[in-house]
């Protein structure tokens, strides 16, 4: 889970942990990028607006890295305009959720669709 908001990071971490997933958190895109290059993950969930590296750049770097191209990526962002959603999907995100219409069940269903149940 990559998000500069402690509240959002903890919410997503607890939601996934309570379902049996092992969760690692990163405070921004740069920390997320360093983590995915050095550890093995089944899924990345990232915000867009973050310091040092935004989520779009993180998704793009993941999609450009030969050893990470198949890593599923979800964006969960406050940006709710259609052009923001399209930008995230064009960068290579598998799912794009807005925090304003965020539902735990939707996120968990998307995680299950991408990597299966914990």
Where do the PLM segments sit?
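Short hydrophobic/Thr-rich beta-strand motif most characteristic of the beta2 strand and flanking loop
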Residues: 20-27, 35
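Active-site beta3 strand of CheY-like receiver
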Residues: 39-45
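Active-site residues of response regulator receiver
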Residues: 47, 77
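Charged docking surfaces used in two-component/phosphorelay signaling
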Residues: 10-18
């Amino acid at each position: 889970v990559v998000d500069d908001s402690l509240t959002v990071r903890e919410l997503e971490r607890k939601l996934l942990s309570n379902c049996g997933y092992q969760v690692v958190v990163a405070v921004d895109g740069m920390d997320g990028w360093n983590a995915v290059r050095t550890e093995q993950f089944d899924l990345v969930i990232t915000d867009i607006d973050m310091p040092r590296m935004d989520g779009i750049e993180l998704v793009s770097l993941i999609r450009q890295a030969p050893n990470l191209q198949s890593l599923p990526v979800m964006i969960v962002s406050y940006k709710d305009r259609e052009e923001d959603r399209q930008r995230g999907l064009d960068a290579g995100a598998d799912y794009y959720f807005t925090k304003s219409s965020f539902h735990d069940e939707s996120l968990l269903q998307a995680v299950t669709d991408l990597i299966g149940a914990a």
